[in-house]
Amino acid sequence: MTETSTVSIASSAIVCVEADIKGEVIIKEGCVVHPFVVFDATKGPIYVGENNIFEEYAVIRNNSDGQPMIIGDWNIFQVHSKSSAKYVGSRNVIGVHAVLEDGCSVSDDCSVGAKCTVFSHQNLEPSVSVYAATNLSRTTKTPNMTSPHQIEFLRKILPSYHHLYGKKKAVATASASAAQ
Amino acid sequence: MSELLQYSRIKYECTCGKFRTLPDLVFCRYCFKIKCDDCSLGEVDNIFCPRCLEPSSVPEARLKKHKCASCNDCPKCANVLSARTENDNVYLVCQYCRWSSREANQEDQENTKSWPTKENPLVNQLGEVTAYMKRLELIENAPKDLKKGKSGKAWTAFHLKDKFGFQQMVDKRKKALAPEMNPVDAHAPTEAPTLEDEIKERTDDLRTLDQIIMQPLINISEPLLPVQVPLAGRVQVRCDECERTLIKRDFGVTTFKFKISSFARQFVPDIRMSRPVDDLKVGETSHVFLSITNLSSSAMDLTIAPQSGNGFIQCSSDPIQLLLPSSRASDTAAPGVHADQSDVIVFRQHNRVGLRLDVIPTEMDLSSPCLNLLITYCQDGSFRLSSASDKILKPEETCPDPILSANLKVDLR
Ligand SMILES: [Zn+2]
Ligand SMILES: [Zn+2]
Ligand SMILES: [Zn+2]
Ligand SMILES: [Zn+2]
């Protein structure tokens, strides 16, 4: 293993083996990464906080030149969403097929509706909702419902039906350290 | 679907002379005519909510102002609102744009039913005016009705069903035999708001036209309310000549089955383009590939005659006669010309035949090339038999079906 491809996954995080993780990626406690999620940190590191859910085919790609990409806690990246945002805060919901363009940033409690785009020059204030085909945005008083039940359920159920990334890696690092 | 199957490219001529795609046409077996939406009668046979599928009777729907009491749409993005419970009370939330009824300064309710809506502030005044106009109408019509000998007795059982609110009208007429005339006060004119006023009162969020149309009564200074879902009607189709039902769906709104269905597909040959047409060049012969399917329950004698001129593309192929077996007898070998014996017939497959027609476009055709075909077809008589199954036919009555013909427009673009 080279220095640039260090994947660090916390012990309580559930990362399916089908996830495609490249480069320096840190995933903290309690996160759930479904199969076929892509973390592409070949151009810069990706730091993921606690208790985030990454659904199937979500793509998290750092397109900056060496700048770290930071994702906070309790976010949900739904199916087929694409994120190249330099910063995503906490408790956000990124909808199905939503796109966060290069260099944009999302603060806390935001929601990006299905198929909506946050453009690269945009910095979403707290509690902003992006919706409709024309990417209307407004500040909302309604909080996102990120219930802890969903992530707890996923953490419990996923290991029974999927091979986990951590397990495979653990075996690989064990054999690597034995060879040293 | 019709785009996928390329139905939209071929238009059939209806009995009334209009051109429609085959799925839009119905067929009356009794009149033996093709009918389109313009020459048939539509009739609402069921009123229901498109969200919760709860059916309503006509008076019930009128009472509810044709809106569902329990379903609400988001006033911002028109998605479905879902209910969230908090402290035994519910409020409505849009999962898509995160609008909630709390943003409209609405108190949480005990249940999702009858969410408050904006009523017309002038509703009482309007009612008074309409009542007054009705009384005027009565007085004006009274001498005419007397002359005609109509004295309110001519009401039939049809009206007693009160499907269209006639009973109410009758009652009102009876009551209003000697209507009193109290002229309604004219609505006092109010000052029209100036542009400055409107700008001052306006909230920060501008509304789209769709949002305003969903709730036209709400002023720009007031917050938007949850939109009650308008009810939808299901239509049954009748023939305009014999008034027999041609299309009627099964009871219940959740079913997609038909009780009576008499679509033109079941009778008319189904003609489609089987391959896209190559680029048309002036003076050069191009091929148009058609597939013709007999979906009816009896064998069909069909003649296809290409028509030229009158703004249609020149077709050099001769008229072709085909005998198509029914879809039921599809495993018996098809009689008639075999594929390898004809230039025109490309393939033969059970109840389906592929044709190749040659067209020579001129300069004028290129902008909107259109091929005109005259089809003449005739079933072997079993169709008429099945339509007359409610009476016993004498042997001499079992004649072949009448010959029908229709023009076809094939869009070659
Ligand atoms: Zn018609
Ligand atoms: Zn409803
Ligand atoms: Zn909404
Ligand atoms: Zn008829």
Swiss-Prot record, chain A:
InterPro entries: DCTN6, Trimer_LpxA-like_sf. GO terms for molecular function: dynein complex binding. It comes from the Eukaryota. GO terms for cellular component: cytoplasm; dynactin complex. SUPFAM superfamilies: Trimeric LpxA-like enzymes. It is found in: Cytoplasm, Cytoskeleton. GO terms for biological process: mitotic spindle organization. Keywords: Cytoplasm, Cytoskeleton. Part of the dynactin complex that activates the molecular motor dynein for ultra-processive transport along microtubules. Subunit of dynactin, a multiprotein complex part of a tripartite complex with dynein and a adapter, such as BICDL1, BICD2 or HOOK3. The dynactin complex is built around ACTR1A/ACTB filament and consists of an actin-related filament composed of a shoulder domain, a pointed end and a barbed end. Belongs to the dynactin subunits 5/6 family. Dynactin subunit 6 subfamily. This is Dynactin subunit 6. It comes from Caenorhabditis elegans.
